[in-house]
Amino acid sequence: RMEVKEAVILDFLMDRMIQAVLYYDTDRELNAIDSRVLSFISDNYKKAYSYQAEGKSEAEKLYLRLLLVTDYVCGMTDSYAKRLYQDMNGII
């Protein structure tokens, strides 16, 4: 049962975070929700992305944005991922 719960949490976080970063660092304006979701990602991860993305094509930047999310979610503790999932879903 625990693995199923964890898979649901990770799937949700990955889906939501990926949606939020799709247009990060592009000419397209982010909506309020995506901006808020991006605010959860630490500046260290964003700085690493910016460093790596400098001078890259849009396709390469998209790959790096997806990697940004993967690195962020993989770096979460189980308890933090669960708490973030609950917060994002309004679960108390």
Language-model region placement:
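Histidine-centered, transition-metal-coordinating active-site segments
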Residues: 1-92
